[in-house]
A protein has these predicted regions:
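Conserved beta-strand positions that form and line the central face of beta-propeller blades
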Residues: 11-14, 122
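Short Cys/His-rich Zn2+-coordinating modules
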Residues: 13-22
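Sequence/structural segment immediately N-terminal to covalent heme-attachment motifs in c-type
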Residues: 27-32
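Short beta-strand His + acidic residue motifs that chelate non-heme Fe in jelly-roll/DSBH
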Residues: 42, 143-145, 164
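A short glycine-rich, His/Asp/Glu-containing loop-to-beta-strand
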Residues: 109-139, 145
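Short, conserved beta-strand element in jelly-roll/cupin
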Residues: 135-139, 147-163
Length: 169
């Protein structure tokens, strides 16, 4: 797969620092799994972050530190949004970071019909302002006119489309 559009360095750096919400992290992690150019930027950001952590003064650990730590993590809620996938449908390519978020039923993705040639699969991800989903668009299908509120990021996993200005594949 040839990657022709890339997330901004700012998004990659935010992902590397752990500052992105889950919805945007899914997109960036999926992109990084396919794009060595952006993966190099990510790896450099992680190296810089590691160097910065090395320069931080260490904190004193008391006799009760470990007990306090384990008390905190014992009370953390489990994240129900991440569900391990079952078998991947035949002839379907899904990058690993995305695969764990897909709900399969009998080895198939549960697509919701949106119109002729249009299917949608919602992905649960915690985010205050973003949604994640898969669109399956049959060749030659025109996407109905629709509005956008906020910022939209799209990642083409297979095939391609044009919006009248740019071609995405």
């Amino acid at each position: 797969m040839t990657v022709s559009h890339h997330p901004t360095e700012e998004l990659i750096l935010s992902y590397a620092s752990g500052a992105l919400d889950e919805a945007n992290s899914i997109l960036i992690a999926t992109h990084l799994s396919l794009c060595s150019e952006c993966r190099d930027i990510y790896n450099a950001a992680e190296s810089i972050g590691g160097e910065l952590l090395d320069d931080i003064d260490t904190a004193e650990i008391t006799n009760t530190s470990f007990d306090e730590f384990f008390s905190i993590i014992e009370h953390l809620p489990l994240d129900p949004a991440i569900k391990p996938s079952t078998s991947l449908p035949q002839n379907t390519f899904l990058p690993n970071p995305l695969r764990d978020y897909i709900n399969f039923s009998n080895g198939k993705i549960n697509w919701r019909w949106l119109g002729p040639g249009l299917r949608y699969h919602s992905i649960e991800a915690s985010s205050e302002f973003a949604k994640v989903g898969l669109l399956k668009i049959s060749p030659g299908t025109k996407v109905p006119h629709h509005g956008h509120s906020g910022k939209e990021m799209t990642m083409v996993i297979s095939g391609g489309y044009t919006d009248g200005i740019d071609k995405f594949s």
